[in-house]
C-alpha cells in the first residue's frame, strides 16, 4: 500500500509522521503544524495496515477531540478519492466508517469508557450519571459537608460522653470570629489535591509526618534536613556571593579597605556554618547566625566620585547580607528549640485531625454520590486507574493488546495521575507511546498540570531514531506568523527563559524558526508595537488600578480606531492578496477576564463592535449584582448594602439625593427601618416635590417586596426569579444596555442555575444565596456565551481561550499585571509535592505562629509562584506570538 509523503512537510515533520517502534516525544512549538502531523501520522498508520479503532488518541479538550476526528475523516476521504487501486480505496472507506467509534477523545472520556466496560472488576454499579456541572458538584459537596461538620460539632465521631475538643481547636485555627468558612476552604482544597494523586488516602495520611519532632532534636529530623536545610544553605550561599563582591569592591580603594575586616569575619562565620550545617543543633544555628551578623556601617572619609560609586555598591551588598541573615533569624529561629518543638507537636495534632476530618468528608461524599448514582471527573480517573491497576487486570491486558499506539496531544498539560493511566495502557514490547506538546505553552498549573513530565522526557529521550528506546523530535518552524513576529518572540524568550526559570533553555532547538514563506516579500511588514499609557498627575484617580485598566482600554480603542480609519491593509491567506482590515481580524488577549467590563463599556463609547468570547466576570456584571442584592433583600431586608444597591438600581431608581433624604429623616436605624419610617411619617406638605418622588418609588417597591417575599416562602426559587423579571421588566431593561444580549444571557443563566439547584433536591432561598456566594468565592462563572460567531466584531478572550486560534492583529493587554501571591497570605499553604503547611494559632496567647512546614513550603512556593507567573507571561508571548500573522501591539 502507498506510503504517505507530503512534499510540504519539513524533514522533522516527516520524521514525526514516519518513525515508530519506540516512544516518541515531539516538542512542537506553537504554529508548527503539530495537528497536521498528528493527523498525517494516523493516516500513515492506516496506510501501513493499522485499523483506526486500534489507536488511542488523547486530546486535552472535547473541542480538540472533535476537530481531530473531523480532520482524520477529511484526510481519509481525500486519500480515498485520490486512491487508484480498488483495494486501497475500499480499505480507506472501511476505515472512514470506523472513525466515529474510534477512541479519539479526552482522557476523561476514555476513563468513562473503561469504567462502563470493566465496572465488574471493582464491583461497581454500571448505572450512573456523570456530574459534569462544576456548580452542581459543589452544591452536593456543600450539602454533605454541612452534615459532616455538624456531626463533628455535635461530637458524633467520638465515644459517648467524650468531647471532640480537637475539632473545635481545628475550626478556630482556620476560621474567624464571623464564620468557619476557613475550615471549609481548607477541607475542600485538600480533597481536590488528594484526588489529583494516584492514591488520595496515602497522600493525605503522609501530611502529618512533616510535623514529627525527632528525639535527637529539631535539626535532626528528616524534614529539617530535606526541606529547611537547603533553604538555609541557599540563603547563606547568596550571602557569601554578595560578600565576595563586597570584598572585591573594598580592594578598589584604600579608603574602602576599612570594610575588609568586617567582611572577612562574616565570610568566615558563614563559611563555617555552611560546612557544619548538617550537624548543627537548633541553638547553634541561632547563636552562629547571630554572631555572623554584620556590625554597624563604617564611616569613611570624603570620597572621590568613583570611590563613592563603589562604596554605594559595597554598602548595598552588605545591607543585603544583613537583611538575609536577620530574615533567617526572624523567620526560622525566632523561638528557642523547646518552644518551636511544642508548636510543631500542637500543629501536628491539628493536621492529623484535619486529615481525619477530610477523610471522613471524602467517605461521606463518595457514599452520597454512590447513593445518587453519580460520578464526578476525579472519580473517572481514580476508578479507571483502580480498574487498570488490579492484579492481572483484564482491562489492562485488553487495552495493551488492543492499542497499537497511544497518541497524546498537549502532553505538557498532563498530571501524574493521568500519566499513570496512560502508562497502564501502553505496551512494553515494543513501546508505542507518541506524545506531542510544548513545555513553553503549559499554562494549566492551576489544574495541577505537571510540565516536568514533559521536561524529563525531553532531556532523557534520544535525538535520533537509532536510539531505539526513545526519540525526541523537534518541530520549531512557525507556519502562522510573519518573520517580525517570530523575531520579537525569540527576543523576549532568549532574555527570560532558561533551565531554572522555564524548564528548558531557550536555545536554537526551542526558538521559533520562520516557516510562513507564503507571505509575499514585496509587501511591507508591520512592526511590533508597545503602547504605553501614562497618567498625568492632574488626571490621576484615587484608585490606580482602575486608572490603569481604563487607560489601557482607551489606548487600545484609539489605536483600533486609527487602524480602521486609515484602512490598514493585511494579507489574506485564503484570498492570497492584500485587503482592508476588518473588525473580525482583531483580537484582544489578556491573562484574566478582569478588564472585560471596561472593554464592553469603552468600546461601545468609541463605536467599536466587540464580542466577549470567554465568559466574562459573571458575578461582577451590573445586572447579576442587582439580582443577587434583590434576592438577599427578599431573604432578609435588614441588610443595608444590598438594600441600598436595589434602591439605587433601575428596579427602583432612587438617586443619591433621594437616598440621602431617607437617611436624613432617620439617622440611627438600619436603612430598612428608615424606609419604613419615611413612609410612615410621610407628610406631603413638608417633604416637597423630591419627597413626593421618593414616596412614590418606595411605595411601589415595598409592594413588590412584600409580594416577592410571599412567593419566596410559598413557591420555588425559579418562580420567584421569573416573577421578578416579569414584574420589574428588568430582563427587558438590560436588553437595551450595551452588550444587551450578553446581559440577558447572564440573567437567564441565573434562572437556569436556580432550576438545576431545585431539580437536585435543594430548597430554600437562604441556602441558594449561600450557594451562589460559594460560587463567587471560588470564581465559578455561570455566564452563557452569546452566539455571535459570524458578526464582524473585535474578539476579546483570555490567553487560555486563544490556544490554536489565529488572528491577523493581536492586542496583548494587561502586560504590567503583578504576580498574584494571594495564596501565600492564608493560614495554610498547599503543594502537591511539599504537602501542607499551617499557621498555628496559640489560642491562649492569641498568637499566630508559622510552623516549619509552612515556612518551607511558602519559601519554595513563593519562588515557584514567581517562576510560574513569569513563565505564564512568557508563554502568553509565545501563544500570542504564534497566532499573529500581521501586527502585534502590546
UniProtKB/Swiss-Prot annotation:
PANTHER family linked to this entry: ATP-DEPENDENT HELICASE_NUCLEASE SUBUNIT A, UVRD / RECB / PCRA DNA HELICASE FAMILY MEMBER
Residues of the UvrD-like helicase ATP-binding domain: 7-482
Annotated protein name in UniProt: ATP-dependent helicase/nuclease subunit A
Cross-referenced NCBIfam families: addA_Gpos
Keywords: ATP-binding, DNA damage, DNA repair, DNA-binding, Exonuclease, Helicase, Hydrolase, Isomerase, Nuclease, Nucleotide-binding
Catalytic activity as recorded in UniProt: Couples ATP hydrolysis with the unwinding of duplex DNA by translocating in the 3'-5' direction; ATP + H2O = ADP + phosphate + H(+)
UniProt GO molecular function: 3'-5' DNA helicase activity; ATP binding; ATP hydrolysis activity; DNA binding; exonuclease activity
Quaternary data: Heterodimer of AddA and AddB/RexB.
Lineage: Bacteria, Bacillati, Bacillota, Bacilli, Lactobacillales
Limits of the UvrD-like helicase C-terminal domain: 510-804
Gene name for this UniProt entry: addA
Keyword Hydrolase attributed: yes
Cofactors that this protein relies on: Mg(2+)
InterPro entries: AddA, DNA_helicase_UvrD-like_C, DNA_helicase_UvrD/REP, P-loop_NTPase, UvrD-like_ATP-bd
SUPFAM superfamilies (UniProt xref): P-loop containing nucleoside triphosphate hydrolases
Amino acid at each position: 500500500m502507498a506510503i504517505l509523503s507530503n512534499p510540504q512537510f519539513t524533514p522533522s515533520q516527516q520524521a514525526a509522521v514516519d518513525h515508530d517502534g519506540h516512544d516518541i516525544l515531539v516538542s512542537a512549538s506553537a504554529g508548527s503544524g503539530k495537528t497536521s502531523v498528528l493527523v498525517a501520522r494516523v493516516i500513515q498508520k492506516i496506510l501501513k495496515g493499522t485499523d483506526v479503532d486500534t489507536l488511542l488518541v488523547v486530546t486535552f479538550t472535547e473541542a480538540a477531540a472533535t476537530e481531530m476526528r473531523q480532520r482524520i475523516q477529511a484526510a481519509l476521504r481525500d486519500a480515498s478519492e485520490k486512491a487508484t487501486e480498488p483495494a486501497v480505496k475500499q480499505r480507506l472507506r472501511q476505515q472512514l466508517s470506523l472513525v466515529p467509534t474510534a477512541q479519539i477523545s479526552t482522557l476523561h472520556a476514555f476513563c468513562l469508557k473503561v469504567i462502563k466496560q470493566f465496572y465488574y472488576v471493582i464491583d461497581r454499579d454500571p448505572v450512573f450519571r456523570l456530574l459534569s456541572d462544576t456548580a452542581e458538584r459543589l452544591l452536593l459537596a456543600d450539602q454533605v459537608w454541612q452534615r459532616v461538620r455538624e456531626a463533628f460539632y455535635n461530637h458524633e465521631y467520638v465515644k459517648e460522653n467524650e468531647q471532640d475538643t480537637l475539632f473545635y481547636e481545628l475550626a478556630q485555627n482556620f476560621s474567624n470570629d464571623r464564620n468557619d468558612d476557613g475550615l471549609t476552604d481548607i477541607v475542600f482544597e485538600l480533597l481536590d489535591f488528594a484526588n489529583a494523586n494516584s492514591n488520595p488516602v496515602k497522600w493525605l495520611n503522609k501530611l502529618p509526618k512533616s510535623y514529627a519532632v525527632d528525639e535527637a532534636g529539631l535539626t535532626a529530623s528528616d524534614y529539617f534536613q530535606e526541606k529547611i536545610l537547603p533553604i538555609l544553605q541557599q540563603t547563606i550561599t547568596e550571602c557569601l556571593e554578595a560578600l565576595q563582591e563586597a570584598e572585591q569592591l573594598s580592594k578598589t580603594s584604600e579608603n574602602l579597605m576599612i570594610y575588609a575586616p568586617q567582611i572577612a569575619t562574616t565570610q568566615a562565620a558563614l563559611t563555617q556554618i555552611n560546612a557544619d550545617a548538617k550537624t548543627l543543633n537548633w541553638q547553634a544555628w541561632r547563636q552562629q547566625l547571630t554572631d555572623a551578623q554584620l556590625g554597624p556601617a563604617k564611616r569613611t572619609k570624603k570620597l572621590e566620585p568613583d570611590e563613592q560609586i563603589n562604596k554605594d555598591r559595597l554598602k548595598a551588598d552588605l545591607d543585603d547580607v544583613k537583611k538575609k541573615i536577620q530574615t533567617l533569624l526572624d523567620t526560622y529561629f525566632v523561638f528557642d528549640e523547646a518552644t518551636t518543638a511544642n508548636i510543631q507537636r500542637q500543629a501536628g495534632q491539628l493536621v492529623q485531625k484535619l486529615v481525619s476530618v477530610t477523610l471522613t468528608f471524602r467517605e461521606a461524599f463518595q457514599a452520597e454520590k454512590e447513593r445518587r448514582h453519580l460520578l464526578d471527573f476525579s472519580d473517572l480517573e481514580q476508578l479507571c486507574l483502580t480498574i487498570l491497576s488490579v492484579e492481572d487486570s483484564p482491562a489492562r491486558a485488553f487495552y495493551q493488546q488492543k492499542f497499537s499506539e497511544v497518541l497524546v496531544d498537549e502532553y505538557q498539560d498532563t498530571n501524574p495521575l493521568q500519566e499513570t493511566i496512560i502508562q497502564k495502557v501502553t505496551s512494553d514490547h515494543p513501546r508505542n507511546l507518541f506524545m506531542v506538546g510544548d513545555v513553553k505553552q503549559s499554562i494549566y498549573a492551576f489544574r495541577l498540570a505537571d510540565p516536568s513530565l514533559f521536561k524529563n522526557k525531553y532531556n532523557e529521550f534520544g535525538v535520533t531514531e537509532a536510539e531505539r528506546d526513545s526519540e525526541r523530535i523537534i518541530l520549531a518552524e512557525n507556519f502562522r506568523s510573519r518573520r517580525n513576529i517570530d523575531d520579537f518572540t525569540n527576543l523576549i524568550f532568549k532574555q527570560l527563559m532558561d533551565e531554572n526559570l522555564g524548564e528548558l533553555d531557550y536555545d536554537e532547538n526551542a526558538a521559533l524558526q520562520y516557516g510562513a514563506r507564503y507571505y509575499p516579500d514585496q509587501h511591507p511588514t508591520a512592526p511590533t508595537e508597545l503602547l504605553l499609557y501614562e497618567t498625568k498627575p492632574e488626571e490621576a484617580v484615587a484608585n490606580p488600578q482602575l486608572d490603569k485598566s481604563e487607560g489601557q482600554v482607551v489606548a487600545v480603542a484609539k489605536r483600533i480606531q486609527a487602524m480602521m480609519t486609515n484602512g490598514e491593509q493585511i494579507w489574506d491567506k485564503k484570498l492570497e492578496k492584500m485587503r482592508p482590515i476588518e473588525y473580525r481580524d482583531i483580537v484582544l488577549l489578556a491573562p484574566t477576564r478582569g478588564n472585560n467590563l471596561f472593554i464592553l463599556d469603552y468600546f461601545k463609547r468609541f463605536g467599536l463592535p466587540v464580542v466577549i468570547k470567554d465568559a466574562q466576570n459573571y458575578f461582577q456584571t451590573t445586572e447579576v449584582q442587582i439580582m443577587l442584592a434583590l434576592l438577599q433583600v427578599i431573604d432578609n431586608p435588614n441588610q443595608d448594602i444590598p438594600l441600598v444597591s436595589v434602591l439605587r438600581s433601575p428596579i427602583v431608581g432612587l438617586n443619591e439625593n433621594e437616598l440621602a433624604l431617607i437617611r436624613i429623616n432617620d439617622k440611627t436605624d438600619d436603612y430598612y427601618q428608615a424606609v419604613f419610617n419615611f413612609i410612615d411619617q410621610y407628610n406631603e406638605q413638608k417633604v416637597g416635590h423630591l419627597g413626593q418622588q421618593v414616596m412614590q418609588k418606595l411605595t411601589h417597591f415595598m409592594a413588590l417586596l412584600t409580594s416577592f417575599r410571599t412567593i419566596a416562602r410559598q413557591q420555588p426559587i425559579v418562580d420567584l426569579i421569573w416573577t421578578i423579571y416579569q414584574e420589574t421588566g428588568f430582563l427587558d431593561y438590560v436588553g437595551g444596555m450595551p452588550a444587551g444580549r450578553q446581559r440577558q444571557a447572564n440573567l437567564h443563566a441565573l434562572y437556569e442555575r436556580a432550576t438545576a439547584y431545585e431539580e437536585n433536591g435543594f430548597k430554600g432561598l437562604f441556602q441558594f444565596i449561600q450557594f451562589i456566594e460559594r460560587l463567587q468565592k471560588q470564581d465559578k462563572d455561570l455566564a452563557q456565551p452569546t452566539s455571535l460567531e459570524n458578526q464582524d466584531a473585535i474578539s476579546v478572550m483570555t490567553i487560555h481561550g486563544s490556544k490554536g486560534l489565529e488572528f491577523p492583529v493581536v492586542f496583548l493587554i494587561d502586560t504590567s499585571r503583578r504576580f498574584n501571591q494571594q495564596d501565600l497570605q492564608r493560614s495554610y499553604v498547599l503543594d502537591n509535592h511539599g504537602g501542607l503547611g499551617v499557621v498555628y494559632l496559640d489560642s491562649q496567647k492569641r498568637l499566630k505562629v508559622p510552623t516549619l512546614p509552612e515556612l518551607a513550603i511558602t519559601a519554595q512556593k513563593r519562588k515557584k509562584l514567581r517562576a510560574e507567573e513569569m513563565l505564564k507571561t512568557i508563554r502568553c508571548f509565545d501563544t500570542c506570538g504564534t497566532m499573529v500573522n500581521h501586527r502585534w501591539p502590546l
